[in-house]
Design a protein with these regions (language model features):
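Polybasic, lysine-rich low-complexity intrinsically disordered segments
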Residues: 4, 16-17, 34
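Periplasmic/cell-envelope proteins involved in peptidoglycan metabolism and beta-lactam response
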Residues: 5, 9-12, 22, 26-31, ...
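N-terminal amphipathic/hydrophobic targeting modules at extreme N-termini
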Residues: 17, 38-41, 45-48
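Beta-lactam-recognizing serine transpeptidase/beta-lactamase-like catalytic domain environment
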Residues: 131, 250, 292-335, 343-576, ...
Length: 599
């Protein structure tokens, strides 16, 4: 009872003071006069006390006129204290059970790792991968030397540097590895490398930026389809304070469906790879296109030089412009344009014969045949075979500027060729009618020079029309979008309908003339192919010169194979060439050989 008072009370045995038994001492200055009754005064030094026998303790009050502290009040105090403790304990229990607080507490002992967002792949016409060819896995690395030793040999230089820096970090992290994690006793999550070490269909597909979105080519044009919502799957790891996985726990995968779709192209992977090998061994700058003659579907599209998708910044500084997709750029055309005039003449019922003296003078300007060599009496077939400039200048004069422009437009010149939304072959350039009112400009246009520009894809469409019995079809590369889980098409992409440009009979006549060009004319480097072939060479002046004064030229060959019932239309361009080891016709022949080998 007295322990509840706010002043010191001493319960002692007073034997030396002559007071036997147990007594209570209270200093006189700590309580009021009412407490003095029944007590004995006692002085020790400067302190005065009142002494009370323990059985007869008085009712004590504190302060002025304070009431006594009864036993009931003491019980009430104890009860209040117990109630307070009970309230605190209940509150702690409720906090521990509340989901939000429980989640916060759990979060302090879990680490969430975000896996790379899933991006749809590109597939070829037979459903074979064009991207994601190199298997890779994401594995969760926990602190410690053991993971460092196990994984160091399974990752590239960047991954090795990450491992070295993170050996002592107190948190798990993701690492890309090239070997199957199951062999190391680890769980891996597939994350194939987007592009192969040896590029495949590089310029057509394009590349990604640092955020994983398309920055060029089809990657950019189809970014919304390939990336979907962009949601990421993630791994939740319950970890200790040292960052290691808690005993009995495993990383928990939280799947996220981004809705990303794959895209199937018309490209044939074996044909593309084979044509890329031909280009790499025969040209330093240019492109090769291969079209399926019956449909105008693009089976291969190659542009050189290539760039390194892992070191894009280095390629930006290169003088040979490796980022250009030369199949879609426009160039000076040259003699591969002459079949347009031949087709217009056949449709007009014209097959004139002219005398070639090796040069033609128009408004005081001299236009020469190659080397200035006279060809004598030439008809349309011989003019194509010998690539006689003088003949086509006179034919252009006979047909007239309007007919030439109409024929060029019918074959797709001067118009962009869309391959996907935001991706198209350049429109190139046709001379304006008022420009062709000048006889010199009409002469230039008649054999593919002057202001005429065209993309290799447009030239491919021209020769494909001739090979396909006179029906023009715009080249295309998109076939369908795919559900990558089932491999089934989600949407079959629309293909352009054909339209007749010249009669089937005239197309057959023109094909026969182009076969003669290969067998006896300027394209004999392509002669001797199994099944024969037809085509046309072209050398276009660019007006650009080397420091030594040699003009750079665009060297073309466009044709079809085999000669009867053509299966493929092929265009070869070597741009800005000075000296080349292989002619366009020779490169064409190599492409035909690999097509035959591919079946």
């Amino acid at each position: 009872f007295y322990k509840s008072l706010r002043f010191p009370i001493f319960v002692i045995r007073l034997q030396k003071c002559g007071l036997e038994g147990r007594h209570v001492l209270i200093r006189t200055n700590l309580f009021n006069k009412k407490c003095q009754r029944g007590g004995t005064s006692l002085r020790r030094g400067s302190a005065s006390f009142y002494v009370y026998p323990a059985p007869r303790l008085p009712t004590l009050t504190t302060g002025k006129g304070g009431a006594g502290m009864s036993g009931k009040r003491v019980l009430a105090v104890y009860a209040a204290l117990l109630l307070g403790f009970a309230v605190v304990l209940c509150r702690l229990y409720l906090l521990a059970q509340h989901p939000a607080y429980a989640a916060r507490a759990a979060a302090q002992s879990t680490v969430t790792l975000q896996l790379p967002a899933r991006r749809g792949n590109f597939y070829d016409a037979q459903g074979r991968l064009l991207t994601g060819l190199e298997e890779r896995w994401q594995v969760v690395c926990f602190p410690g030397q053991g993971n460092y030793d196990r994984l160091y040999a399974c990752t590239d230089a960047a991954g090795q540097a990450l491992l070295y820096r993170s050996r002592s970090r107190a948190a798990p992290f993701l690492l890309e590895v090239s070997c199957d994690p199951a062999r190391l006793g680890l769980t891996g999550y597939p994350a194939a490398r987007r592009y192969a070490a040896v590029p495949l269909c590089q310029h057509l597909l394009g590349y990604l930026d640092s955020t994983g979105h398309g920055a060029a080519g089809l990657e950019k044009a189809l970014d919304a389809v390939l990336s979907g919502t962009g949601e990421h799957s993630s791994l939740v790891c319950a970890v200790t304070a040292q960052g290691t996985l808690r005993t009995g726990e495993t990383a928990r995968l939280l799947q996220a469906d981004s809705g990303a779709l794959g895209v199937q192209l018309t490209i044939s992977r074996p044909v593309q790879r084979a044509v890329e090998a031909v280009a790499a061994s025969t040209m330093t700058s240019g492109c090769i296109l291969v079209l399926d003659t019956a449909t105008a579907a693009v089976r291969a599209s190659v542009s050189v030089p290539c760039y390194d998708p892992e070191r894009l910044a280095d390629s930006l500084q290169a003088e040979n412009s490796p980022f250009l997709n030369r199949a879609l750029q426009s160039y000076a055309v040259g003699s591969v344009f002459k079949p347009v005039l031949a087709a217009a003449a056949l449709e007009a019922g014209l097959q004139p014969v002219f005398e070639c003296t090796g040069a033609v003078v128009v408004d005081g300007q001299i236009f020469r045949c190659a080397g200035g060599v006279p060809h004598g009496q030439v008809d349309l077939a011989a003019a194509l075979e010998k690539s006689c400039n003088g003949y086509f200048i006179r034919l252009g004069q006979q047909l007239g500027a309007e007919s030439l422009l109409d024929a060029a437009k019918a074959f797709g010149f001067g118009q962009s060729l869309p391959l996907a939304e935001g991706l198209a072959a350049e429109a190139g350039q046709l001379p304006a009618p008022q420009e062709l009112a000048q006889s010199g400009q009409l002469a230039n246009f008649s054999f593919g020079q002057g202001s005429l520009l065209a993309a290799p894809m447009q030239v491919a469409a021209l020769f494909n029309t001739i090979a396909a019995d006179g029906v023009y079809r715009s080249p295309y590369v998109l076939q369908a979008t795919l559900d990558e889980t089932t491999g089934q098409p989600v949407e079959t992409l629309s293909h352009p309908r054909g339209r007749r440009v010249i009669s089937a009979q005239n197309a057959a006549l023109l094909r026969a003339m182009l076969v003669q060009v290969v067998q006896q004319g300027t394209a004999q480097d392509a002669a001797g192919l199994s099944g024969g072939a037809g085509g046309k060479t072209g050398t276009a002046q660019t007006g650009q010169f080397t420091p030594e004064g040699t003009e750079r030229c665009n060297l073309w060959f466009a044709g079809f194979w085999p000669a009867e019932k053509p299966r493929y239309t092929i265009v070869v361009l070597q741009d800005g060439a000075v000296h080349t080891a292989y002619s366009g016709a020779a490169i064409f022949a190599q492409v035909c050989n690999v097509l035959e080998a591919a079946g």
